[in-house]
Amino acid sequence: MSAPAANGEVPTFKLVLVGDGGTGKTTFVKRHLTGEFEKKYIATIGVEVHPLSFYTNFGEIKFDVWDTAGQEKFGGLRDGYYINAQCAIIMFDVTSRITYKNVPNWHRDLVRVCENIPIVLCGNKVDVKERKVKAKTITFHRKKNLQYYDISAKSNYNFEKPFLWLARKLAGNPQLEFVASPALAPPEVQVDEQLMQQYQQEMEQATALPLPDEDDADL
């Protein structure tokens, strides 16, 4: 993927989107308008696949984002959902502690099938003022060597960050950049820029702290 394939085919990667129901996974993936327009439903496993294209300084890259269509509310997902995934996003809701508490379960299911793939952890709904999951408590990604981003699906805040990080990992090229923004749905809410800067500083400060004792093996 250091350059577009000579035969003109766009490098395409299967990305699985996991996390508790209600954390905003579908809202997030639907922000990308061409992906929403071109999505396909796979009835056998109850999944919507959204092809999300991004344009980089090395050509186009596409993520086939698998969204569960709400099945996770009825327990875990079938292995067929995870098989052949090349990267993943685990999402939780920063206004709901239980969704963060369940992140290790999603991670365990993912790595049991996919083993060593690049994974981004995303804390969604940072536009909501009553944030419950604070920066200092978000440590799981550090223990498991994942990338973490605060996001707000409804405002498009940090929408591209997880995809850029994954694209660089998959391409093996930290110099890869997105050169054009995808068409996104208009923001439904606005984020408070000062608050976002404060959250970012808190995350950076938290990263410098030693990890808490392993009272609980997963958290």
Curated annotation (Swiss-Prot):
Residue numbers spanned by region Switch-I: 39-47
Residue(s) carrying N-acetylserine: S2
Entry GO terms, CC: cytoplasm; cytosol; nucleus
Any GO MF annotation of the entry: GTP binding
UniProt entry keywords in alphabetical sequence: Acetylation, GTP-binding, Nucleotide-binding, Nucleus, Phosphoprotein, Protein transport, Transport
Phosphoserine found at: S2
SMART domains documented for this protein: RAB (SM00175), RAN (SM00176), RAS (SM00173), RHO (SM00174)
Top-level taxon in the UniProt lineage: Eukaryota
Record's subcellular location: Nucleus
This protein's record includes keyword Nucleotide-binding: yes
Family annotation (Gene3D superfamilies): P-loop containing nucleotide triphosphate hydrolases
Ranges for domain Small GTPase Ran-type: 9-173
Keyword Protein transport: yes
One Gene Ontology biological process: nucleus organization
Matches recorded under NCBIfam families: small_GTP (TIGR00231)
Function summary: GTP-binding protein involved in nucleocytoplasmic transport. Required for the import of protein into the nucleus and also for RNA export. Essential for cell viability. By analogy with Ras, Ran may be activated when GTP is exchanged for bound GDP by RCC1 and inactivated when GTP is hydrolyzed by Ran upon activation by RanGAP1.
UniProt name for this protein: GTP-binding nuclear protein GSP1/CNR1
Biological source species: Saccharomyces cerevisiae (strain ATCC 204508 / S288c)
